[in-house]
Each structure stands twice: as C-alpha cells, then as structure tokens.
A protein has these predicted regions:
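Short glycine-/aliphatic-rich beta-strand segments at the starts of folded cytosolic domains
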Residues: 1-4
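N-terminal start-of-chain detector that recognizes signal peptides
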Residues: 6-11, 52-56
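Short amphipathic alpha-helix segments
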Residues: 7-21
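A short linear hydrophobic-aromatic micro-motif
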Residues: 23-27
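Helix-rich interaction surfaces within compact, conserved domain-sized segments
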Residues: 30-33, 37-86
C-alpha cells in the first residue's frame, strides 16, 4: 500500500514519524509530493507525529496534506492504519 503527501513542512514531519514507526517503509521524494510505500501494513501514529511536530496533532489533519492513498483504511483518534489483505 502507499500514502502520498504534498511536499511541505508539515508533511516532512509526518514522513519522519512514519519512518520511525514503520522501519521498512520506502520513501520516494518526487516533485511537489512524497510517496511512502510499505507491504502489508503502514501506521501513522498521532503520538509520534506530535513528537515530531512539537504540538498537538489530530489524525484528521493528515487529510490536509494527503494527495492519495492505497490500501484498506482503519482510522481512529490515535492512528491511521493502511493494510493490504489478500
């Protein structure tokens, strides 16, 4: 599955958090966007993003920077999880 964000300051902190919580993630920097790919499961954790940003962060804020995503989405107030079940 994949997650594509606009390439901006907030997204860069989100990418750092995703890399910390998902060590196997592949990050691809492209013009104006950042694509993250991972097999099976990718998690964006509120707590980790808050640590990187240095402020409170609502998982719904991810949608402000989101270009596209692929996979099954499970979202609550603490995390957004993308998975791929065959």
């Amino acid at each position: 599955m994949y997650l594509i964000l606009q390439d901006n300051d907030v997204s860069r902190y989100i990418v750092e958090a995703v890399e910390e919580d998902n060590p196997e993630v592949t990050v691809i920097y492209q013009p104006a966007m950042i694509r993250m790919e991972q097999e099976n499961l990718m998690v964006v954790k509120r707590e980790t993003v808050e640590e990187k940003l240095g402020r409170d962060w609502d998982v719904q804020e991810l949608h402000l920077n989101l270009i596209s995503l692929g996979g099954n989405v499970d979202e609550d107030e603490d995390r957004l999880e993308l998975s791929w079940v065959l």
